[in-house]
Swiss-Prot record:
ATPase activity is stimulated by ViaA. GO terms for cellular component: cytoplasm. Belongs to the RavA family. It catalyses: ATP + H2O = ADP + phosphate + H(+). Signal peptide: none annotated. This is Regulatory ATPase RavA. Homohexamer. Interacts with ViaA. SMART domains: AAA. Pfam families: AAA_lid_8 (PF17868), ATPase_RavA_C (PF12592), bpMoxR (PF20030), LARA_dom (PF20265). It comes from the Bacteria. Component of the RavA-ViaA chaperone complex, which may act on the membrane to optimize the function of some of the respiratory chains. RavA functions as an ATPase. Its main location: cytoplasm.
Length: 498
């Protein structure tokens, strides 16, 4: 692929030109452009008067000397109105059944068919052949048709289990459009003086026939990496498990992959990237219910698996668990260990402080911080005499939290290993240790594992940063992926500070 970044820049500028004067239709224009550049079909769903036909007309200007055909279907539409009238001369002179196709669908590069579901069987059958094989049977001859983009539109979906489903399945990209929502865009639309039929694309940006044919071959050379295929397979398996998921044919999956290849190609990449999979949200849905379901499943895939977010969190959880185990082992070694007294005839077990503890005020460190009396506590100061009395006779024990303020009542106990343990209101405990005996910093094993995990996170974030320069992916999706990666990074950094 020659000069991939220049091609990506050119396609971006081409799309910007096509979008001029159209408000809140950038995503639709970009996907229709992608479909046109890869020879696919688009279905636009939405109420009348929202620029569905204008979108199709604009796409004609993406190509040099492209011809367009536009038709509004009715229940009374005939094949002659779409594919051309019969040649009376050929029928009369030579007895040949032949259509005059000039100016009709068989000779158009860009085709727009409005109210598509009102077409009759005679039109539908011929249209299916045109979409599938890019061929048109004209009498005794089979003619190749130049159609690069078919845009079909309607304000309703086809009825389930109808003869229209075969045609609907050929519409790879499906877009649900609505009227202009933003106030500023609505005002701009009302006051715009631009002629909608003017060509907004400079000649230098228009695609030539030679370029189009060459790109079709180069799109097929874009590779599908193993890790991207695994993501697609995960999505397919997940959809198969959901009872309300739409049926997705093998044909649709295969055509969708070519669309992903085209997205990568026109983004300047030589391989499909996880970010391209977001396009599947506009390819796999069938109706309103499945539209939401597909978007949810792809969102989970993108924010949880595509850049190993969930895998990194799982690794982080294992590292944290190992750190806790090491902390517990260290606590057993460094905790303040009391001396058990005989007390054979005593109803309560008695203890005393180790002989090397002689200070009148003892500052004991919590092996892990606890929230006590609405305060994050890391150490507690005890009067030696009060602690000795509690060890001997029990009752109430008080200490200064973090060594400040008045002494507060504490839930203190001696565990089976003769260590002092303080508990919070939820009964979470923390073993107490003398200053200097608590391990400082992260163990080397944990530190190394966290550094390796952070390095992997940086690699994944760098990959996403490189891949997100994709014209065909909405910014809000990229924002959610960035947030998911930043959340993983924040959790790793937090673990490094423990």
């Amino acid at each position: 692929m020659a000069h991939p970044h220049l091609l990506a820049e050119r396609i971006s500028r081409l799309s910007s030109s096509l979008e001029k004067g159209l408000y809140e239709r950038s995503h639709a224009i970009r996907l229709c452009l992608l479909a046109a550049l890869s020879g696919e079909s688009v279905f636009l769903l939405g109420p009348p008067g929202i620029a569905k036909s204008l979108i199709a007309r604009r796409l004609k200007f993406a190509f040099q000397n492209a011809r367009a055909f536009e038709y509004l279907m009715t229940r009374f539409s005939t094949p002659e109105e779409v594919f051309g009238p019969l040649s009376i001369q050929a029928l009369k002179d030579e007895g040949r059944y032949e259509r005059l196709t000039s100016g009709y669908l068989p000779e158009a590069e860009i085709v727009f068919l409005d109210e598509i579901w009102k077409a009759g069987p005679a039109i539908l059958n011929t249209l299916l052949t045109a979409i599938n094989e890019r061929q048109f049977r004209n009498g005794a001859h089979v003619e190749k048709i130049p159609m690069r983009l078919l845009v079909a539109a309607s304000n309703e979906l086809p009825e389930a289990d109808s003869s229209l489903e075969a045609l609907y399945d050929r519409m790879l990209i499906r877009l649900w459009l609505d009227k202009v929502q933003d106030k500023a865009n609505f005002r701009s639309m009302l006051t715009s003086q631009q002629d909608e039929n003017d060509n907004p694309v400079p000649d230098a940006l228009q695609v030539t026939d030679e370029e189009y044919e060459r790109w079709q071959k180069e799109i097929g050379e874009i590779t599908l990496p193993d890790h991207v295929f695994e993501l697609i397979f995960i999505l397919r398996q997940q959809l198969d498990k959901l009872p309300d998921a739409p049926y997705v044919s093998d044909r649709r999956w295969k055509k969708a992959i070519r669309l992903l290849q085209a997205s990568a190609f026109f983004s300047g990449r030589s391989a499909v990237a996880p970010v391209d999979l977001i396009l599947l949200k506009d390819c796999l849905w069938y109706d309103a219910q499945s539209l939401n379901l597909i978007q949810q499943q792809i969102d989970v895939l993108m924010t949880g698996h595509a850049w190993q977010q969930q895998g990194m969190l799982t690794r982080l959880g294992a590292i944290v668990q190992r750190h806790l185990q090491l902390q517990q082992q260290q606590s057993d070694k460094t905790a303040l260990t009391l001396i058990r007294l005989g007390g054979i005839f005593s109803r309560r077990q008695q203890y005393q402080l180790p002989v090397n503890v002689t200070a009148s005020t003892l500052t004991l460190l919590l092996q892990k911080p606890l929230k006590l009396h609405d305060m994050e506590v890391v150490h507690i100061s005890f009067e030696r005499s009060a602690l000795e009395q509690w060890l001997s006779k029990g009752g109430e024990i008080r200490g200064k939290l973090n060594g400040i303020g008045f002494a507060q009542k504490l839930n203190l106990e001696v565990d089976s290993t003769q260590h002092l343990v303080v508990r919070d209101v939820s009964l979470q405990g923390s073993t107490l240790a003398l200053p200097g005996s608590s391990a400082e910093g992260l163990p080397g094993e944990i530190k190394q594992q966290l550094e390796e995990l952070e390095s992997d996170w940086r690699k994944q974030h760098a990959l996403f940063s490189e891949q997100q320069k994709c014209l065909f992916i909405p910014g809000d999706w990229l924002g959610r992926i960035e947030d998911s990666l930043q959340d993983v990074g924040a959790q790793i950094r937090q673990a490094q500070q423990c």
